[in-house]
Amino acid sequence: MKLAQKEHKNIYLFIGADKCHFCKMFKEKTLSKKWVMKRLKEHYEVLYLSRDRHYVPKKFEKFGVPRHYFLDANGKIIFQSFGLLEPSGFFTMLDEADLNSND
């Protein structure tokens, strides 16, 4: 969060699991696209946590992955979503998160 504060960016937190088929598909179909990551990194610090390998704070421990959280630089949730998203659906979610962050 310190980096996000320093860079004046919000945070995109993707929580997945190593053996999650839909998490792998999201990475392959959406996050692997350079134009998706370009837009994401313009406004967000990007973090990935695997429930299998990383500590996941309690406020993000919800059933099911992939989980998508958009946080302000202080860690407050401004938007959240669940599931596999194609690039167009992910962009819609980014638009919604951007709108919520301006409230």
Enumerate the language-model features and the residues they cover.
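Short amphipathic alpha-helix with an adjacent loop that forms part of the alpha/beta core around
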Residues: 56-61
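Non-catalytic, surface beta->alpha helical segment in thiol-disulfide oxidoreductase systems
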Residues: 63-103
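Thiol-based oxidoreductase modules, predominantly thioredoxin-like and allied folds used
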Residues: 15, 31-54
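Loop/turn elements at helix/coil->beta-strand transitions in domains of secreted/extracellular proteins
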Residues: 7-11, 42-47, 73-76
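Solvent-exposed loop/turn segments at secondary-structure junctions
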Residues: 18-21, 29-30, 51-55, 75-77, ...
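Local sequence-structure signature of Cys/Sec-based thiol-disulfide redox active-site neighborhoods
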Residues: 1-32
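Extracytoplasmic/secreted proteins, especially bacterial periplasmic and envelope-associated proteins
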Residues: 22, 35, 89-93
